[in-house]
């Protein structure tokens, strides 16, 4: 089944990006020795709890949280996606990936400490675009990883989807088994 395209104008995108920056960058400022911390784990492993631990470990650092899944709610066609009962993840993917990349770029360019929350599924991209550049700009880089078995990731993803369907109407995250398998392999390559 083909996913409907929920296109938006460049002006609408820029307005959404500015709102994301306002909501997530807040008072964070450029630092002489900024930190990049990856909060990594397979899908539904519980990695979203890692930023709280990181901030506790670094109470004097003002981190920007970069989490592609959080940016989905800023999509300019969110109401239409909901009204159409469309696949939330597929319908917002291109948008949230673009926001994520621009937030990474913004933090790197401005030497702002940030936590990148994700599966580290595509390590090659992270290494070339983020890690190498962050090192060159003086970022201290760390990884906080939460590893679970592939089976646990699949069960947790299904439970999360069911809970989100119940509580978030059409804004649930459905994660395919093939994506979990791909993320598990990428995570092992990246962290293992």
Segments (PLM) and residue ranges:
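Conserved nucleotide-sensing/catalytic segment adjacent to the nucleotide-binding pocket
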Residues: 60-131
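The conserved Walker
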Residues: 42-43
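N-terminal pre-Walker A segment at the start of P-loop NTPase domains
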Residues: 1-29
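Conserved lysine of the Walker
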Residues: 47
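Conserved GTP-binding G-domain of TRAFAC-class P-loop NTPases and closely related GTPase folds
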Residues: 57, 155-192
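Hydrophobic positions on the alpha1 helix immediately C-terminal to the Walker A/P-loop
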Residues: 50
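Conserved phosphate-donor/acceptor-positioning beta-strand/loop module used by diverse small-molecule
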Residues: 135-157
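Phosphate-binding P-loop
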Residues: 26-34, 107-108
